[in-house]
Amino acid sequence: MIIGNIHNLQPWLPQELRQAIEHIKAHVTAETPKGKHDIEGNRLFYLISEDMTEPYEARRAEYHARYLDIQIVLKGQEGMTFSTQPAGAPDTDWLADKDIAFLPEGVDEKTVILNEGDFVVFYPGEVHKPLCAVGAPAQVRKAVVKMLMA
């Protein structure tokens, strides 16, 4: 897991991640439509979404097997829960078809609050629970870059 802000990219950030974030900065605006946008076909693409955050207890943890996530908050605020422990057995396993598995929660979860411009990177296998409300549920606009790793 890596956390940062798109307006202050650290020099140690891997080049491929930096390039993907720079692409979002250069091409995504408030008018960019929701949905999937290709950068390099299915190897590298991003999803624009506008969703309501929900109470922590209502959200399910997830992880991926093939794709890395770069989750970028474009507008609003989001609680992002994560675990540094192995996922364990999922209760919903769609890894083969959709590269996502769900479980009720991660082991020893921790939460970070992401504001506009903040990003978090989750590598395959890293458990995370996005769209957790910070206080009352609120709308958040995000870009999620998907980078094929396996």
Curated annotation (Swiss-Prot):
InterPro entries: NanQ/TabA/YiaL, NanQ/TabA/YiaL_sf. Influences biofilm formation. Represses fimbria genes in 8 hours biofilms. May act in response to the combined activity of several toxin-antitoxin (TA) systems. Belongs to the TabA/YiaL family. The modification N6-acetyllysine is found at K36. It comes from Escherichia coli (strain K12). Disruption phenotype: Deletion increases biofilm formation after 8 hours and decreases biofilm formation after 24 hours. Transmembrane segments: none annotated. Keywords: Acetylation. One of its GO terms (biological process) is single-species biofilm formation. Induction: Induced by simultaneous deletion of five TA systems (MazF/MazE, RelE/RelB, ChpB, YoeB/YefM, and YafQ/DinJ). Signal peptide: none annotated. GO terms for cellular component: cytosol. This is Toxin-antitoxin biofilm protein TabA. Pfam families: DUF386.
